[in-house]
Amino acid sequence: MAWDGRLYVGTGSQGDANRPFMAVKPGASGDITLKPETTSNEFVIWRQGRVAGYTPSAIVHAGKVYLVHDTGILAVLDAKSGKQIYKVRVGGGGQTFSASPVAAGSRVYFLSEDGVTFVLDTGDAYTEVAKNELGEMSLSSPAIAGNARYIRTQSKLYKIAY
């Protein structure tokens, strides 16, 4: 994904326990591999290890990168510096995630495979402002259009508008 003159790239593939995520300068070419024990170079602005998920994609919103791992571990990074703002288990644990998060205004939405939507504030600390249980499995990422949120579960499509 691209934001504010940077490209954000995650490599949370199966078998790579490090799961790095990095910000790269557009126009980088050739081998931009980081040397061991380094977190930046001419093309890589910053790199954080052990934060990228296997299935959910990351998002950048309100100057922060939100990365949720399949096991529910959420890492929030400063989008410019890559510094970790916080790392926590969404909902306190026990949830798994395939859906990518979405964001609007001062809220970020995470939908678990059990159909539980966690609504978080975009502040510098984990603040769960709402939790909605839909009662059935969901593997789809929510969508936002205008003032509506769309959530698909195994058998239903919900539109939540305000």
Predicted regions and their residues:
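Noncatalytic, solvent-exposed loop/strand surfaces
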Residues: M1-Y162
